[in-house]
Amino acid sequence: MPEAMTAMDSQDERAQRLVLVTGPSGAGRSTAINVLEDLGYEAIDNLPLSLIPRLLDGPARPMPLALGVDVRNRDFSVANLIELIDRLTRLPEYAPEVLFLDCTTEQLLRRFNETRRRHPLRGEGSPLDAIRAERDMLGPIRARADVLVDTSELSPHDLKAELARWFETEPGRRLTVSVQSFSYKRGVPRGVDMMFDCRFLANPHWRTELRPLDGRDSPVQQYVMADSRFDEFFRRVRDLVLFALPAHLEEGKAHLAIGFGCTGGRHRSVTMAEKMADALAKAGWQVSIRHRELERREKAPAPGDEGHMRAARTAWAQG
């Protein structure tokens, strides 16, 4: 993924950062607003477009601003929003950016069906008709986006990590490193900067006593690390990452994502991720760790219990 190039790059560094958050209903706009608020933005959602200039004419704010805009805004129209974007771009005191949350039509339809929420544009037609109409309506805004994020395969956790890459508010903050394991069968995670394939290492899956365990368990780690290729592989990857981290920090990056993949995302990749996170932390870097497939298993609802899944789906359908 390319480096985050924002409107701020060409404006005075003293200009206040202003993010307009929009996109089709169900793509995660409300979730994005909450994430930006957590990142230190003053977040305001669904303010009528006609009131935004009045808001900005007031006293300077001590923090960057994130404004949620969608078809539910009282006076929303594509022409009005484009006019607002053009007006903001001409103001020297602001550095506006358009964040567009996108999603496939199929995934949007699935989210609305699962949460049973009514699409804001649905009249007599079907939800699919409303989704397509909104997508067509927002086409010109999408074309004007400074940052485009496709949430089709992102969890709320993934979206938070992705937005942190683009909209971190503390440029002096130390670079943080996220290490994650994943299964190639379920697809490569979005937003990974450095990715390493662990499928050549000895596979504990074929050992009956190790199969139900995972790479956080000592017997599995010992088995994987007993592979004669493990030590050199680990050392080379660790040294490469430790070499690259200071360079990324000098370039102004706030976050670096490292992924380790194997077939099932349960044993080899988890072992490598655990060991690498520990090594980087000992080297003084701020590290977080995530095991994507293990999280999916742990969060899977028991038969007949769909409470957790409904909550996750609702988080998307609200925005």
Curated annotation (Swiss-Prot):
Q: Can the keyword Nucleotide-binding be found in this entry's annotation?
A: yes
Origin, by domain of life?
A: Bacteria
Keywords for the protein's UniProt record, in alphabetical order: ATP-binding, GTP-binding, Nucleotide-binding
Instruction: For the region Disordered, give the residue spans.
Output: 296-319
Give the Pfam families listed for this entry: PapZ_C (PF22740), RapZ-like_N (PF03668)
Entry binding sites for ATP: 23-30
Q: Where is the composition biased (Basic and acidic residues)?
A: 296-309
Q: Any idea which positions bind GTP?
A: 70-73
Write one Gene Ontology MF term. ATP binding
Question: PANTHER family, from UniProt?
Answer: RNASE ADAPTER PROTEIN RAPZ (PTHR30448:SF0)
Q: What does this protein do?
A: Displays ATPase and GTPase activities.
Q: Which family does it belong to?
A: Belongs to the RapZ-like family.
Please report the name of this protein according to its UniProt entry: Nucleotide-binding protein Pden_2850
Which species is listed as the source? Answer: Paracoccus denitrificans (strain Pd 1222)
